Every structure is written in structure tokens, then in C-alpha cells.
């Protein structure tokens, strides 16, 4: 019985070591991937979306004031290309955890340019939508804004 207990303890310790090693390896792999992938297209896409939202809000405000001149904006081919390339970049990352880290990295770099909490919320919202738009569904347990954890 004592030998069985020792054997079980050794197996449990071995499983823990292997799991910890795999996790550490996964973290290092993600860091390498994030250094290699260029997230510029994602940043450009998010910038365009936030700018578009602001223009739409300004247009609504003009309408409410009775100004009839409203700019209709259609999605340009450049915007579509930025989104496509962004999705390709995110898809290159091999795990949801790594994709989440990429979105957090974009948030950290882009939030510095935000003028107020409303723009930060728009940024967060656009980043949360991105995985669904790219076709790999919502990221589970991914807090885009690491300051809110």
C-alpha cells in the first residue's frame, strides 16, 4: 500500500512537471510569435473603424441640428484589405491565449492615442469583435484591457 502511494505521488509530480514545462514552452512560443507577427494591419483596421464611428456620430449630431449634408461612407477596398490581412496575422498565432495577447498588445499601443474613456471603450469593443469578424469566434477568458483584470 505504501509503495502504491509513493508511485501515485511520483506520477502526480511527473504530470505537474510536464504540465508546467508545456505551459512555459507555450508562453515562450507565444512571445516569439508576437515578436514575429506584424499587427500593423490590425491597428490600421481598428483606427479606421473608430474614425468611421466618430464620423457617423458627427453625422447624427448634424442631422439632429437640422443640417442635411450627411456624408455616406462606404467600406473601401483598402479597409477590406486591412481587415483581411489583420485576420491572417491573428490566424498565424497558434492559440487563443496568444491571439488574446495580441489583442491586448494592440489595446495597449492604441489606447495611448485615445482621447477619453469613450474612445477607449470603442477601441475595446472593436477589438472584442475582431475574432468573430475574422471567423474564429469569441476568445474565451480574454480581457482586452489588462488594466481591468
Swiss-Prot record:
Lineage of producing organism: Eukaryota, Viridiplantae, Streptophyta, Embryophyta, Tracheophyta
Segment forming the signal sequence: 1-22
Cystine pairs: 30-98, 42-86, 87-134, 87-134, 100-142
Protein name: Conglutin delta 3
InterPro entries, per database record: Bifun_inhib/LTP/seed_sf, Bifunc_inhib/LTP/seed_store, Napin/2SS/CON
Domain of life of the source: Eukaryota
Family listed: Belongs to the 2S seed storage albumins family.
Annotated PANTHER family: 2S SEED STORAGE PROTEIN 1-RELATED (PTHR35496:SF20)
Amino acid at each position: 500500500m505504501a509503495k502504491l502511494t509513493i508511485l501515485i505521488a511520483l506520477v502526480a509530480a511527473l504530470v505537474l512537471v510536464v504540465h508546467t514545462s508545456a505551459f512555459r514552452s507555450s508562453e515562450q512560443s507565444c512571445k516569439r510569435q508576437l515578436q514575429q507577427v506584424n499587427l500593423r494591419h490590425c491597428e490600421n483596421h481598428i483606427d479606421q473603424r473608430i474614425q468611421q464611428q466618430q464620423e457617423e456620430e458627427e453625422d447624427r449630431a448634424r442631422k439632429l441640428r437640422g443640417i442635411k449634408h450627411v456624408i455616406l461612407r462606404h467600406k473601401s477596398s483598402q479597409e477590406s484589405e486591412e481587415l483581411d490581412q489583420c485576420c491572417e496575422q491573428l490566424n498565424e498565432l497558434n492559440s487563443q491565449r496568444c491571439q488574446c495577447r495580441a489583442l491586448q498588445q494592440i489595446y495597449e499601443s492604441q489606447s495611448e492615442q485615445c482621447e477619453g474613456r469613450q474612445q477607449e471603450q470603442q477601441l475595446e469593443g472593436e477589438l472584442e469583435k475582431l475574432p468573430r469578424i475574422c471567423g474564429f469566434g469569441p476568445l474565451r477568458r480574454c480581457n482586452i484591457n489588462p488594466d481591468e483584470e
